[in-house]
């Protein structure tokens, strides 16, 4: 089994924000076939489908296609006060994700590429965790989103999660049965019952 990982960060209230990490889990032998099923989702001229750039009808098409792929998904969230610096929240989410994936024997993890310096921090982070006794077989690589269609899956899953907070539940409803694990980091704030929390 392999995991393909993307991130998202959104405001939740006037004073809080949420950092999310999403992973699509795909069996190794199915990866190429799933990539071929996803490729038609890329429009002419697009580098990749990207949730924030898509229309409502396109979002429906994308989530419907993903719901039929057979991939399973993990979503990890960290709710905090508003802060422009999110690398610490990313590390906390990745720690929870790595723990859950290792427990499921998913050790081959592809993260969407960011900048060289940010990717270097990801690699240093996993080395530090392994030096503390974490599973030594966990392996991360980075890849540009346009180069691997499997990275389009977590982008859409996190997009659907974020849309649900603004009352657009139809996308997440299509994907609900594919979300295997949904966790908050140990240091995450709990959602305020007064905010528009999704069901």
Language-model regions, residue ranges each:
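Phosphate-ester processing/binding pockets and catalytic centers
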Residues: 1-199
């Amino acid at each position: 089994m392999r995991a393909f990982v993307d991130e998202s960060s959104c405001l939740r209230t006037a004073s809080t924000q949420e950092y999310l990490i999403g992973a699509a889990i795909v069996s190794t032998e199915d990866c190429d076939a799933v990539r071929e099923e996803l490729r038609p989702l890329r429009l002419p001229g697009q580098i990749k489908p990207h949730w924030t750039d898509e229309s409502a009808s396109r979002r429906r098409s994308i989530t419907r296609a993903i719901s039929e792929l057979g991939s399973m998904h993990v979503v990890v969230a960290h709710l905090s006060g508003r802060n422009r610096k999110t690398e610490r929240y990313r590390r906390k989410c990745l720690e929870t994700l790595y723990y859950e994936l290792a427990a499921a024997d998913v050790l081959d993890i592809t993260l969407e590429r960011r900048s060289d310096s940010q990717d270097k921090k990801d690699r240093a982070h996993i080395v530090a965790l392994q030096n503390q006794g974490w599973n030594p077989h966990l392996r991360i690589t980075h890849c540009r989103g346009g180069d691997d269609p499997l990275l389009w899956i977590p982008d859409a899953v996190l997009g659907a999660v974020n849309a649900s907070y603004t009352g657009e539940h139809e996308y997440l409803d299509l994907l609900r049965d594919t979300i295997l694990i949904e966790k908050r980091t140990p240091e995450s704030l709990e959602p305020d019952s007064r905010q528009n929390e999704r069901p």
